[in-house]
Design a protein with these regions (language model features):
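N-terminal anchoring/stem segment of glycosyltransferases
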Residues: 1-73, 94-97, 145-147
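Short, surface-exposed amphipathic charged segments that create phosphate/polyanion-binding patches used
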Residues: 70-80, 137-140
Length: 210
């Protein structure tokens, strides 16, 4: 049994509608206890729509911004939404002692994701190693082991905060800090977190021929 998690505001509801409908159409709901949706700026009509789905639980956040932006401007609105993802994922993991799957709200479920999850790993990260840089992307993340998942989140969040100090103008912090965190943990002889891969060819459209 798993819980699911995503972040959504009104500007992304065009994607959120596809996300939730495709989830209910193409994924085995018997394997899902709760679908947690972090509200970073949903309108009343958005909330009303999402609450029609029986497994959905809305989580209030400390952000109420219905718009979005690109990643680069100072005080980027988009970035404010993204930075809540790891923070509240960790809170949900602590709250409900079940494995947790995070899928970005601008994704669409085309088949059952659970057949691609390696249960032997403590955490699973989305591997796109065909890229020349940043072999892992933060759009799909799984914590199978709650305690070690929280430890991984702690390391990831700490690395992200450090990256924001080191390179404040880069804009995209989430995936790059994830890559730095993974490399550091894999090179740490004291690390006890087993990190596995979920490949983009199975959970993302980047390698699918349409």
């Amino acid at each position: 049994m798993y819980n699911l998690f995503t972040v959504l505001n009104s500007a992304y509801m065009i994607f959120g509608v596809v996300w939730i409908k495709s989830l209910y159409e193409n994924v085995d709901l018997n394997k899902i206890k709760t679908i947690y949706i972090l509200d970073t700026g949903l309108k009343d009509k958005d909330l009303q729509f999402l609450k029609e789905f029986d497994k959905v639980e809305i989580i209030n956040s400390d952000l109420n911004e219905t718009s979005t932006s690109d990643a680069l401007p100072k005080n980027s609105i988009w970035l404010q939404h993204v930075l809540r993802k790891t923070k509240y994922f960790r809170k949900v993991l602590r709250k409900d002692d079940l494995p947790l799957v995070m899928v970005d709200s601008d994704c669409m479920f085309v088949s059952d994701i659970f057949e691609h999850l390696d249960l032997e790993s403590d955490v699973l990260v989305c591997n796109r190693s065909y890229k020349d840089y940043d072999n892992w992307i933060a759009s799909f993340f799984v914590a199978n082991n709650v305690d070690k998942g929280i430890k991984f989140l702690n390391a990831w969040i700490s690395r992200m905060k450090l990256l924001m100090i080191e390179q404040p103008n880069r804009g995209w912090f989430e995936s790059h800090s994830l890559n730095l965190c993974i490399e550091e943990l894999k090179n740490d002889p004291k690390n006890e977190i087993k990190i596995g891969d979920v490949f983009t060819k199975n959970v993302a459209c980047e390698e699918i021929s349409c």
